[in-house]
Amino acid sequence: MASSSKCAFLVFLCMIVLLAPSEVHAKSMAKAQGGWYLVEGLCSKFPDCNKHCKEQGFLGGQCLKLGVNMLCFCIHT
């Protein structure tokens, strides 16, 4: 019984770490629905995400909820 509660605590701790807001400005890409999405950052930093992404040379962009944050994703195919 004690080991299952320890396991549950570790899973809970990992979820907190993974979902916590991060100030890391590294860009990451994810493949989804036939295209690549580049994460530019928090939508609060890019209020017009679509315009920002087009200025960066991408097809466009949109703010999507990922965890507790709204992130600006630029679309690249």
UniProtKB/Swiss-Prot annotation:
Disulfide bond listed as a keyword: yes
Keywords for the protein's UniProt record, in alphabetical order: Antimicrobial, Disulfide bond, Fungicide, Plant defense, Secreted, Signal
Gene Ontology CC annotations of this record: extracellular region
Coiled-coil regions listed: none
Protein localization: Secreted
Disulphide bridges, residue numbers: 43-63, 49-72, 53-74
The UniProt record lists the keyword Amino-acid biosynthesis: no
InterPro entries (UniProt xref): Scorpion_toxin-like, Scorpion_toxin-like_sf
Signal peptide per UniProt: 1-26
GO biological process: one example: killing of cells of another organism
Family named by the database record: Belongs to the DEFL family.
Protein name: Putative defensin-like protein 30
Organism: Arabidopsis thaliana
Highest classification ranks of the organism: Eukaryota, Viridiplantae, Streptophyta, Embryophyta, Tracheophyta
